Amino acid sequence: MNAWLILICAGLLEVAWAVGLKYSHGFTRPVISVFTVVAIVGSMLLLGVSLKKLPLGTAYAVWVGIGIIGSSMLGMLLWQESVNFWRIISILAILSGIIGLKLTA
């Protein structure tokens, strides 16, 4: 499987575990807590697999960037976190950085 696709899946699992952390209420909800731990482990495993082919700095930055963008977007959509011009510009800057890293890797 393509290392970039694996890395994207790892990033999406990072978003899943971040949301799981929010819903687990400090790991006091067992089912959601198990989901969260599985997502954490899966995210780390996939990141590790992607590192067989991708440079560490690039892969880590993309992985974190996907997590930041995904969790920020879900925070705005699900929990009414602030939506303002500078927040959107910052998210777009992260996205452009991810695209730049992909194009230069």
Describe the predicted segments one by one:
Residues 1-105:
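Polytopic alpha-helical membrane proteins, predominantly small-molecule transporters/carriers
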